[in-house]
Amino acid sequence: MLKSSKKEDSSKKNQNNKLIFTVRKLFSPIKNFFRKTKTPDNFFGVIKRLKINSQKMTLDERNILANLLELEYKTIEDIMVPRSDIAAIKLTTNLEELSESIKLEVPHTRTLIYDGTLDNVVGFIHIKDLFKALATKQNGRLKKLIRKHIIAAPSMKLLDLLAKMRRERTHIAIVVDEYGGTDGLVTIEDLIEEIVGRIDDEHDQQLDSDNFKVINNSTIISNARVEVEVLEEIIGEKLQNDDDEFDTIGGLVLTRVSSVPAIGTRIDISENIEIEVTDATPRSLKQVKIRLKNGLNGK
């Protein structure tokens, strides 16, 4: 296992402290919003007044301010983790089995618990509660460790969700469709990232759903959930028609095949573009490699 030096640890600590200071400084004029008012219009009025005086702000502060203003238009559907990517455990699982599953499969501090199917989520378990129960040699099922979640619609505004999480004192919302089925998941961390930006681990080599990596002039590695218009802008080629019902690169691939393709499958998208599936489950695409026969912008 690689160990970071004291100098690297100190640098990372200083970066975290700087971020905390920036957020506290910027939020001081609006810290009483959730205590005194429940009206989003009032909240954005405060933010817009801050923007008028933003000349003296640092770059970090201006970026956070811009992200706050975007919350006025963003909904849960814009940021939720889709159903196919949700990691969850059955209610009938015992503590020892859950501990092993988390070690092997679920790299999160919170894990959803469902009864029967994922459409019946009963709550979630925090990993610290699990380890405490194991340390004290508690036996039995998961019910006594389950924490409550909230239910939200995909159309709910992010600021409304943030306020609801605070009122209900929970950090997880299950997104349900019109029939009551589980459509996705949003955590408090997802909301915070929308405000302060994504904070990447220095050793994390995985791509997130907001970008892709240009390897060279003819190769791009991309998360399948990256929007097609991002790829179009990079390669200078139109791939989506106005009446198409997909938004992501994964959706583009699925329009060319009858089922989710296996890892290693190559699909010709156009005369210039070939997409190879590099990561997938039986139900969804995860990551793809995009080969440009003529190079970026035909170069």
Curated annotation (Swiss-Prot):
PROSITE patterns: CBS
Domain CBS: 80-142, 145-202
Record keywords, A-Z: CBS domain, Repeat
Keyword Cell division: no
Pfam families: CBS, CorC_HlyC
Gene3D superfamilies, per the entry: 3.30.465.10, CBS-domain
InterPro entries registered for this protein in UniProt: CBS_dom, CBS_dom_sf, FAD-bd_PCMH-like_sf, FAD-bd_PCMH_sub2, Ion_transp-like_CBS, Transptr-assoc_dom
Coiled coil: none
Cellular component per GO, a single term: plasma membrane
GO MF annotations in UniProt: flavin adenine dinucleotide binding
Misc. remarks from the entry: Despite the presence of the tlyC gene, the true SFG rickettsiae are non-hemolytic.
Family according to the record: Belongs to the UPF0053 family. Hemolysin C subfamily.
Protein name in UniProt: Hemolysin C homolog
Organism of derivation: Rickettsia massiliae (strain Mtu5)
